[in-house]
């Protein structure tokens, strides 16, 4: 039997203009309670490169770069059953309420 896993709360504030959506956190992200925590995931390296920042593993610095650049992150799936981290293994998913999030944060201009 597969365990049911849940997404993190959105990282967003009133100044957020861009919303980046993932599927649902993988095993490593769930363990660390951090978005995109697996070292092989390129998300953070791309963000640092995009904004000409020196790469760091420090999660608070990573989150501050998103905030400084008005970027929000969340997942399209609120909860699901999944063995491992592969999206192809997702079963019985329930969607996050993205429409409600966008209504609450009208400054979002791009997803």
Please place each PLM-identified region on the residue numbering:
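A polyanion-binding, active-site-adjacent surface
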Residues: 2-110
